[in-house]
Amino acid sequence: MQMKATILIVLVALFMIQQSEAGWLRKAAKSVGKFYYKHKYYIKAAWKIGRHALGDMTDEEFQDFMKEVEQAREEELQSRQ
């Protein structure tokens, strides 16, 4: 049932892209597609590494990881100012 709903959503989205007069959505999708095609091996490798690294974490380890990510983001923002 979920697969049918996903397929329906994709088909509606494709129809909306086709009917878009401005074509900006089609251009954006094409740009994302080109980026993915060009870097798909790196994207897939990063996805596998991320799933492997995060998949073995307990909830506490994941919370600590997210705190470290947030802290690194804040430090990056402060260094830009």
From Swiss-Prot:
3,4-dihydroxyarginine PTM sites in chain numbering: 26
InterPro entries noted in UniProt: Styelin
Residues modified to 4,5-dihydroxylysine: 27, 30, 34, 38
Pfam families: Styelin
Cell location: Secreted
Positions where 5-hydroxylysine occurs in the chain: 40, 44
Positions of post-translational 6'-bromotryptophan modification: 24
PTM annotation (Leucine amide): residues: 54
Tissue specificity field: Hemocytes and pharyngeal tissues.
GO cellular component: extracellular region
Annotated coiled-coil segments of the chain: none
Alphabetical keyword list: Amidation, Antibiotic, Antimicrobial, Bromination, Hydroxylation, Secreted, Signal
One GO BP annotation of this record: defense response to bacterium
Modified residues (3',4'-dihydroxyphenylalanine): 36-37, 41-42
PTM statement from Swiss-Prot or TrEMBL: Contains L-DOPA (3',4'-dihydroxyphenylalanine).
Summary of the function given for this chain in its UniProt record: Bactericidal against several Gram-positive and Gram-negative bacteria.
Protein name per UniProt: Styelin-E
Native species: Styela clava (Sea squirt)
